[in-house]
């Protein structure tokens, strides 16, 4: 990869890291059969992709969009949500008889504190010096 080719591209893509990512993605596209927009001239795919970016036959913004799309694991599709969502425990829902008989035992703060006082504190373990 000639340094001149990179220097020609740096005014099209400001960040060298982004330039390398875009050129590598375009080189992979060329390897997978994407048509060339310039003559090859016995150059390898990375050099051809840099020359395409330098000659502005390929848009860096389009390449970036394709790169992001190729790296996505899940494609988000905005689907409209249904207007009416049934509420949990609504009148139309069936309720088992066993669920209605469950009663919660209530405890006052004083009873809770008395119960906590009855608990034994954890035993202290001697620290080992190394």
UniProtKB/Swiss-Prot annotation:
Cellular component aspect of the GO annotation: DNA-directed RNA polymerase complex
Known EC number: 2.7.7.6
Pfam families in the record: RNA_pol_Rpb6
The keyword Hydrolase is assigned to this record: no
Chain positions covered by the region annotation Disordered: 108-130
Reaction equations catalysed: RNA(n) + a ribonucleoside 5'-triphosphate = RNA(n+1) + diphosphate
A GO molecular-function descriptor: DNA-directed RNA polymerase activity
SMART domains reported in the protein's UniProt record: RNA_pol_Rpb6
Keyword annotations: DNA-directed RNA polymerase, Nucleotidyltransferase, Transcription, Transferase
Coiled coil: none
Family stated for the protein in its record: Belongs to the RNA polymerase subunit omega family.
NCBIfam families, per the entry: rpoZ
Subunit structure: The RNAP catalytic core consists of 2 alpha, 1 beta, 1 beta' and 1 omega subunit. When a sigma factor is associated with the core the holoenzyme is formed, which can initiate transcription.
Primary role: Promotes RNA polymerase assembly. Latches the N- and C-terminal regions of the beta' subunit thereby facilitating its interaction with the beta and alpha subunits.
Protein name: DNA-directed RNA polymerase subunit omega
Organism from which the protein derives: Rhodopseudomonas palustris (strain TIE-1)
């Amino acid at each position: 990869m000639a340094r001149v080719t990179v220097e020609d591209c740096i005014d099209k893509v400001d960040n060298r890291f982004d330039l390398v990512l875009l050129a590598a993605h375009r080189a992979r596209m060329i390897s997978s059969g994407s048509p060339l927009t310039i003559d090859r001239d016995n150059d390898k795919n990375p050099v051809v992709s840099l020359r395409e970016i330098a000659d502005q036959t390929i848009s860096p913004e389009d390449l970036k969009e394709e790169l992001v799309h190729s790296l996505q694991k899940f494609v988000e599709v905005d689907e409209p949500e249904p207007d009416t969502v049934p509420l949990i425990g609504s009148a139309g829902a069936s309720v088992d008889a066993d669920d209605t008989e469950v009663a919660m035992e209530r405890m006052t703060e004083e009873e809770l504190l008395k119960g906590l006082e009855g608990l034994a504190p954890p035993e202290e373990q001697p620290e080992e010096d190394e």
